[in-house]
C-alpha cells in the first residue's frame, strides 16, 4: 500500500500495563459520550467553525498557476513563524526530505525567528534576484514576520528587484495586507475560520508547496481519505477519537507530558508542528499536556534514561515508516552481528526495543505506522491530528482554537519597541537578583 496509516494502542491497555492501563470496557463506555462529541463537531462544522476541513474542497487551479510562475525562480524564501511556518515545513521535509539531502530547484529557505544572525546568514547565501519570497501572516501584524520582511524588502529595493513579481503575500489583514495592496503583490487570503496551527492544508501551506515537486492534490486527497473515519462515532474505528480519548484518560492518571518520537528524520519537523498544535490548542485553564519532541534513535542516547527511570508522567507516540525511500546495507569484513543488515533494520530494531522496554516499565505508548512517507500519508497524518485536537478540546471542555494567554507577552514586546528604551529596561529587563561572570 502507498497510503496506509495504522494506529496501534496495545501498550496503553490494561492487559499490558496492568492497573496503570486502560480496560476495554472503559473504552467501550466512551462510545456513548464520543457519539455526542462527534455530533457537536459536525454541528460546528456546519456552522463554519472548522475551516481546516472546508479548505479540503478548495479549487487548486490558482496554485497550479502559481506553480508555473514559480519556475522562473531558483529559490523560495518563506518568511513566517508559528503556524505560518511549522506545518508547511513539516509537509515539505516530510514529503521531499531535508534541505541538505535535496539538490533540486527550487531550494527552500525558512526565515522564521527574529534572530539577527540567522536572518543575516540566509541573506548572505541567497540570490534575491532569483528568489520568490513568500511572506505569511494571517493577522498581517506578526512582529517577527514583518521585521524580517521589511529587511528583505529593503534589500530587494536597493537591488532594483521588482517586488510585484518577486513577493507572494498570504494574509487577511493588518500591515501586510495594506502593503500588499499598495505594492500589488501576488496575494492569497487565509480563511477567517482557519487558525494558524490548523492552516497547513490551506493557502498557508498549499501555495508554497505548489512551487515544489510536492503533488498538492495527493496531499489533499490523503487528508480527505481519512476524514470519514475521523468523524466516525465508533471509537474503535476512529483513530483520532481513540487517540484523543487515550491521551485524556492518561492525563487524568497523571501523564502530563506527551512525547512525540518519530523514527525517521524526515518527520522531525512534524514533531515541531505537533508541539504547537497540542500545546497552543489545549494548554488552557490549568489543563494540557506538555509536548516533548524526540527523534528515534537519536533521543535514545539523550532523553530515554529520564523516560525510563524518571517521573512516570509521560505518554509516548512513536511514528514508524514501513518503507524508507533509500536504504543502505552494512558491510564489514570482520565478524560482527551488524554485518549484512540494512540501516532500516537497525533503526526498526531500536524502535522495537524502546517500545517494549517502555511497556516493561509501565510507560504508556502508542504507535502510528505509515506504509511509506508521501503526500497521501502526510495528508492523513495532518488531518488525523487536527481532528484529534478538535476532539480533545471537547473532552477538556475548552476552546481548542484560540490562544489568549500569549497576547500579554506580545503587548509587552510592542511596548518595548514603541516606548522609551530606558523605561522598558527599568520596567521589564533590569533585574534585582543577578549573577554575572566577567
UniProtKB/Swiss-Prot annotation:
<dbReference type="GO" id="GO:0005829">
    <property type="term" value="C:cytosol"/>
</dbReference>
<dbReference type="GO" id="GO:0051156">
    <property type="term" value="P:glucose 6-phosphate metabolic process"/>
</dbReference>
<dbReference type="InterPro" id="IPR046348">
    <property type="entry name" value="SIS_dom_sf"/>
</dbReference>
<dbReference type="GO" id="GO:0006096">
    <property type="term" value="P:glycolytic process"/>
</dbReference>
<dbReference type="InterPro" id="IPR053509">
    <property type="entry name" value="GPI"/>
</dbReference>
<feature type="active site">
    <location>
        <position position="301"/>
    </location>
</feature>
<keyword id="KW-0963">Cytoplasm</keyword>
<comment type="pathway">
    <text>Carbohydrate biosynthesis; gluconeogenesis.</text>
</comment>
<comment type="pathway">
    <text>Carbohydrate degradation; glycolysis; D-glyceraldehyde 3-phosphate and glycerone phosphate from D-glucose: step 2/4.</text>
</comment>
<dbReference type="Pfam" id="PF00342">
    <property type="entry name" value="PGI"/>
</dbReference>
<keyword id="KW-0413">Isomerase</keyword>
<dbReference type="InterPro" id="IPR035476">
    <property type="entry name" value="SIS_PGI_1"/>
</dbReference>
<keyword id="KW-0312">Gluconeogenesis</keyword>
<dbReference type="GO" id="GO:0048029">
    <property type="term" value="F:monosaccharide binding"/>
</dbReference>
<feature type="active site">
    <location>
        <position position="410"/>
    </location>
</feature>
<dbReference type="GO" id="GO:0004347">
    <property type="term" value="F:glucose-6-phosphate isomerase activity"/>
</dbReference>
<dbReference type="GO" id="GO:0097367">
    <property type="term" value="F:carbohydrate derivative binding"/>
</dbReference>
<keyword id="KW-0324">Glycolysis</keyword>
<comment type="function">
    <text>Catalyzes the reversible isomerization of glucose-6-phosphate to fructose-6-phosphate.</text>
</comment>
<dbReference type="InterPro" id="IPR035482">
    <property type="entry name" value="SIS_PGI_2"/>
</dbReference>
<dbReference type="InterPro" id="IPR018189">
    <property type="entry name" value="Phosphoglucose_isomerase_CS"/>
</dbReference>
<dbReference type="GO" id="GO:0006094">
    <property type="term" value="P:gluconeogenesis"/>
</dbReference>
<comment type="similarity">
    <text>Belongs to the GPI family.</text>
</comment>
<protein>
    <recommendedName>
        <fullName>Probable glucose-6-phosphate isomerase</fullName>
        <ecNumber>5.3.1.9</ecNumber>
    </recommendedName>
</protein>
<dbReference type="InterPro" id="IPR001672">
    <property type="entry name" value="G6P_Isomerase"/>
</dbReference>
<feature type="active site" description="Proton donor">
    <location>
        <position position="280"/>
    </location>
</feature>
Amino acid at each position: 500500500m502507498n497510503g496506509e496509516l495504522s494506529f496501534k494502542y496495545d501498550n496503553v491497555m490494561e492487559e499490558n500495563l496492568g492497573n496503570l492501563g486502560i480496560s476495554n470496557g472503559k473504552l467501550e463506555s466512551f462510545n456513548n459520550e464520543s457519539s455526542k462529541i462527534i455530533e457537536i463537531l459536525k454541528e460546528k462544522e456546519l456552522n463554519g467553525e472548522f475551516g481546516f476541513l472546508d479548505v479540503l474542497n478548495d479549487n487548486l487551479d490558482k496554485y497550479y498557476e502559481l506553480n508555473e510562475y514559480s519556475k522562473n525562480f531558483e529559490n523560495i524564501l518563506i518568511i513566517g513563524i508559528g503556524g505560518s511556518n511549522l506545518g508547511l515545513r513539516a509537509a515539505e521535509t516530510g514529503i521531499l526530505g531535508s534541505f541538505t539531502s535535496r539538490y533540486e530547484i527550487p531550494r527552500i529557505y525558512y526565515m522564521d525567528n527574529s534572530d539577527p544572525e540567522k536572518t543575516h546568514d540566509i541573506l548572505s547565501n541567497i540570490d534575491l534576484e532569483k528568489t520568490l519570497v513568500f511572506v505569511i501572516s494571517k493577522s498581517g501584524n506578526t512582529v517577527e514576520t514583518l521585521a524580517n520582511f521589511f529587511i528583505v524588502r529593503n534589500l530587494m529595493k536597493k537591488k532594483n528587484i521588482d517586488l510585484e513579481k518577486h513577493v507572494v503575500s498570504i494574509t487577511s489583514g493588518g500591515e501586510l495586507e495594506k502593503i500588499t495592496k499598495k505594492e500589488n503583490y501576488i496575494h492569497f487570503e487565509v480563511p477567517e475560520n482557519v487558525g494558524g496551527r490548523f492552516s497547513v492544508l490551506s493557502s498557508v501551506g498549499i501555495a508554497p508547496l505548489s512551487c515544489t515537486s510536492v503533488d498538492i492534490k495527493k496531499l489533499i486527497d490523503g487528508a480527505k481519505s481519512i476524514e470519514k473515519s475521523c468523524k466516525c462515532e465508533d471509537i474503535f474505528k476512529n483513530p483520532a477519537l481513540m487517540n484523543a480519548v487515550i491521551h485524556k484518560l492518561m492525563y487524568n492518571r497523571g501523564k502530563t507530558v506527551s512525547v512525540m518520537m518519530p523514527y525517521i528524520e524526515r518527520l522531525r519537523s512534524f514533531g515541531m508542528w505537533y508541539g504547537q498544535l497540542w500545546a497552543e490548542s489545549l494548554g488552557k485553564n490549568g489543563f494540557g499536556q506538555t509536548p516533548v519532541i524526540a527523534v528515534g534513535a537519536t533521543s535514545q542516547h539523550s532523553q530515554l534514561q529520564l523516560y525510563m527511570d524518571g517521573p512516570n508522567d509521560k505518554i509516548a507516540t512513536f511514528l514508524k515508516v514501513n518503507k524508507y525511500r533509500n536504504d543502505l546495507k552494512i558491510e564489514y569484513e570482520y565478524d560482527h552481528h551488524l554485518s549484512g543488515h540494512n540501516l532500516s533494520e537497525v533503526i526498526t530494531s531500536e524502535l522495537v526495543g524502546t517500545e517494549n522496554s517502555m511497556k516493561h516499565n509501565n510507560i504508556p505508548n502508542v504507535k502510528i505506522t505509515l506504509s511509506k512517507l508521501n503526500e497521501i500519508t502526510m495528508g492523513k497524518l495532518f488531518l488525523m491530528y487536527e481532528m484529534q485536537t478538535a476532539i480533545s478540546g471537547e473532552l477538556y471542555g475548552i476552546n481548542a482554537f484560540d490562544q489568549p494567554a500569549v497576547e500579554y507577552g506580545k503587548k509587552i514586546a510592542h511596548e518595548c519597541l514603541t516606548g522609551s528604551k530606558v523605561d522598558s529596561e527599568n520596567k521589564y529587563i533590569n533585574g534585582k537578583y543577578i549573577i554575572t561572570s566577567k
